[in-house]
UniProtKB/Swiss-Prot annotation:
Source organism phylogeny: Bacteria, Bacillati, Bacillota, Bacilli, Bacillales
Gene: minC
Keyword Ubl conjugation attributed: no
UniProt entry keywords in alphabetical sequence: Cell cycle, Cell division, Septation
Classification via SUPFAM superfamilies: Cell-division inhibitor MinC, C-terminal domain
Superkingdom classification of source: Bacteria
Name the record gives this protein: Probable septum site-determining protein MinC
Gene3D superfamilies named among the record's database cross-references: 2.160.20.70, 3.30.160.540
Function: Cell division inhibitor that blocks the formation of polar Z ring septums. Rapidly oscillates between the poles of the cell to destabilize FtsZ filaments that have formed before they mature into polar Z rings. Prevents FtsZ polymerization.
TM helices/strands, residue ranges: none
HAMAP family in the cross-refs: MinC
């Protein structure tokens, strides 16, 4: 009885193209050798055929830039294959640090004055006012226990799920992700709108204003922040 040799490389077709699974328990040299052998088939050597997108799943393996380049060249050179992405379950130190920053909550008690820009990674809880001409930015959500009269930009790295909530809403401008909401002079002169929030509505993909309590329905995970704001 012969034992079937475990494959270092498995190629599977998907609706979007091909997925190359590279066994993370095999040596890199074994993977390169088997990959070259499988790609030697004439099936993968038709440059004049439509391009096929390839996803390379490396599992719990960390690949250096040079190793990725080597695998990418092996897959694409002389073939109708394009590497779309490498998928790994391992994060680099830089990626882990970035993820930590995005998950953090920065609490600050201060007044943002005209001309000042205050920016953080993660969520921002500001206890104080944002005066006209002042700007606050966060890669996550923004909560202001005070008056927001300047500019607030939540999700400034492209997070359209971020929200803005404030005790007193009368900003010059609101931004969430790539969306912008301009506050009219008439609205500013009408006075503060108490305990309001801003978020991107899923049906219109535009910034919508509502009572802070609305966030309990659309973002229930923010209940702790909202309870603190209401108590203030």
């Amino acid at each position: 009885m012969t034992t079937q040799k475990k494959q270092a490389v498995t190629i599977k077709g998907t609706k979007d193209g091909l997925t190359f699974h590279l066994d993370d328990r095999c040596s890199f040299d074994s993977i390169v050798g088997e990959l070259a052998e499988k790609l030697s088939s004439k099936h993968y050597q038709m440059e004049d055929q439509p391009r096929i997108q390839v996803k390379v799943d490396v599992g719990y393996r960390y690949l250096t830039v040079e190793q990725k380049r080597h695998i990418q060249e092996l897959i694409t050179d002389g073939r109708n294959l394009d590497v779309e992405e490498f998928v790994s379950q391992v994060m680099t130190k830089e990626e882990a640090e970035e993820k930590r920053k995005e998950a953090q909550i920065v609490s600050v008690a201060k007044v943002i004055r005209s001309g000042q820009v205050f920016s953080v990674d993660g969520d921002l809880l500001l206890i104080g006012d944002v005066n006209p001409g002042g700007t606050i930015r966060a890669s996550g959500n923004i909560f202001v226990i005070g008056s927001l009269r300047g500019i607030a930009h939540a999700g400034y790295k492209g997070n359209g799920e971020a929200v803005i909530a404030t005790s007193h809403m009368a900003p010059a401008q609101l931004r969430i992700g790539e969306q912008i909401f301009h506050w009219s002079k008439e609205e500013q002169q009408a006075g503060d709108r108490i305990m309001e929030c801003a978020y991107i509505a899923s049906d219109t993909n535009e910034i919508q204003l509502d009572r802070v309590q609305k966030l309990l329905k659309i973002r229930p995970n923010l209940a702790t922040f909202l309870d603190e704001m209401v108590e203030q």
